[in-house]
Amino acid sequence: MIYPTEFDVIVVGGGHAGTEAALAAARMGRSTLLLTHNIETLGQMSCNPSIGGIGKGHLVKEVDALGGAMALATDMGGIQFRTLNASKGPAVRATRAQADRVRYKAAIRHMLENQPNLWLFQQAVDDLVMQGDRVAGAITQAGITFMSRTVVLTAGTFLSGKIHIGLENYTGGRAGDPAASTLGARLRDYALPVGRLKTGTPPRIDGRSIDFSVLEMQPGDDPAPVFSFRGSRDMHPQQLPCWVTHTNLRTHEIIRSGFDRSPMFTGKIEGVGPRYCPSIEDKINRFADRDSHQIFLEPEGLDTHEIYPNGVSTSLPFDIQLAALRSMKGLENAHILRPGYAIEYDYFDPRALRHTLESRRVAGLFFAGQINGTTGYEEAAAQGLLAGLNAARAARDEEGWYPGREEAYLGVLVDDLTTLGVNEPYRMFTSRAEFRLQLREDNADLRLTETGRRLGLVGDAQWDIFCRKRDAVAAERERLKSTWVNPRLVSEEDARRVLGQPVEREYSLEELLRRPGVDYATLATLPAFGGEALSGAVAEQVEIQVKYQGYIDRQHEEVARREATEHVRIPAAFDFSAVSGLSKEVQQKLALHRPETLGQASRISGVTPAAISLLHVYLKRAGAPKSE
């Protein structure tokens, strides 16, 4: 049957990409349908029970700045919070949280069920409705047809998924869930460029079988950082520690003894795994000189004994998994609740997508998450939000939006994917961003929330919080610039206590704050400080902006220089063979990738700066337009 209501946007899949996509489209006022094979697994944390980390936390903050759900759900479900790289500069500081799986999933479910314009339906999707070269809906396994203006595919690891434990394998989307094999086969019929990747997960351990008394405890930060710009510590449930153990030479010997039954070493697995989250057998093989590897024992929640051993992802046979765990300190009597496994799945080459994440071949069809070759909840959520908002805009024939590399880690992510593609699961790092000094966690709202408001993603409550912070930061910065102190106003004793030396002439408070070793809170103890000292995120932002102003200004200048060519548009039907001086190889690569701007063209492997200069001159003569 054809469902009687037509939707603006259909989202296929209810993981981290799908939930953010559906929420984004619905916040923008579009009638949105989220199709999932199981409503009970919406927002499921399929692998590790954590959110954030280096680069990843930056993405979560950006999703939050645009009105997304992940950071807020983490504050509601987080059972340990830490700031990574706390002793380093603000550009690389990152928030990471352990999450209670049940509480996190419940928070996401609550947001979905209470979002106006959003409807849920439990059925796996087997096919898409096509009208020429445009998608027009989705067909479920029961033959129900839902019509829509746009469709967002967020199938995760479910497309033609195959699970491996030792030499045994079976179809599945993840442990306990069926694969989307029919949909995977149908998508291949549409001649979309497809490949295979793999990821893995460790065995889960019953905490009652662990001897924590001999292990090193790793507590969270106190006070705990807050993830969402809309969050607070009052949202956090009870906090728990993690624990640390290590592999040893006996562990490595056991693991090597299983190589002949490993699907990775026997060729049973064809897909490429994530470089930065290798399986334990891969680590033992690649780093044969290492005597030990650190393993973090992470609690899965407040109401369960289940423990996630971070660092032991594996597809080895179960007997090897058990013996390897029991060879480690504190795990001598470990009981495995769920075996570790690897999963192979289909992904589609993201170079076949526009920067809006819309397919170049099928109009109205958007892809987000692991289906694009990424790994990680955070990367998926960021893509989901971008795909959802652009599907919503496309449903009303509005032009798409995406941030540039200089505006957001989301911009870096989508540019890397659609320009360079992937040959292994893609993970975000701060090192991928050229302009990371201005792409910090702390200013994600100042970078993106005004845009989010303009796009219809940011509601009134969030907008009010943002405006109060933005205005308070601006007012305090202006006050620090215009408040002056001199030796008559600051005693030598106070000056040495706060500044480490006397005040020898007149200075603005901003100049004093810029000095190494002087922080805002201590400066505020000077009797001459004047106004009431601010605290929390506002004080942090004021201090960072003042101390790093010179570096940030230089980065802005670098961005401005790059702008000269970055956004020069290349016409969609441009004939690269017409540009004399370009080598055949460069012409072929440009014709294959079809970059939309000179900036995108410059990041294609093998396209030289000289080739970009030639292309720029040609486009200028032809009167190529610049993008907004």
UniProtKB/Swiss-Prot annotation:
An annotated Gene Ontology molecular function: flavin adenine dinucleotide binding
GO BP of this protein: tRNA methylation; tRNA wobble uridine modification
Localization: Cytoplasm
This protein's UniProt keywords: Cytoplasm, FAD, Flavoprotein, NAD, tRNA processing
Residues given in the record as NAD(+) binding sites: 273-287
Annotated Gene Ontology cellular component terms: cytosol
Binding of FAD, residues: 13-18
Keyword NAD: yes
Cofactor or coenzyme needed: FAD
Pfam family for this entry, one: GIDA
Subunit comment: Homodimer. Heterotetramer of two MnmE and two MnmG subunits.
Family stated for the protein in its record: Belongs to the MnmG family.
Annotated function: NAD-binding protein involved in the addition of a carboxymethylaminomethyl (cmnm) group at the wobble position (U34) of certain tRNAs, forming tRNA-cmnm(5)s(2)U34.
Name of the protein described by the UniProt record: tRNA uridine 5-carboxymethylaminomethyl modification enzyme MnmG
Organism annotation: Laribacter hongkongensis (strain HLHK9)
